Swiss-Prot record:
One of its GO terms (cellular component) is ribonucleoprotein complex. One of its GO terms (molecular function) is structural constituent of ribosome. It is found in: Plastid, Chloroplast. Keywords: Chloroplast, Plastid, Ribonucleoprotein, Ribosomal protein. The gene is rps16. It comes from Ginkgo biloba. The lineage of its organism: Eukaryota, Viridiplantae, Streptophyta, Embryophyta, Tracheophyta. This is Small ribosomal subunit protein bS16c. Belongs to the bacterial ribosomal protein bS16 family. The keyword Membrane does not apply. GO terms for biological process: translation.
């Protein structure tokens, strides 16, 4: 999902 991708990018 896009929401999961955005959260993973922000945590990196």
């Amino acid at each position: 999902m896009v929401k999961l991708r955005l959260k993973r990018c922000g945590r990196k």
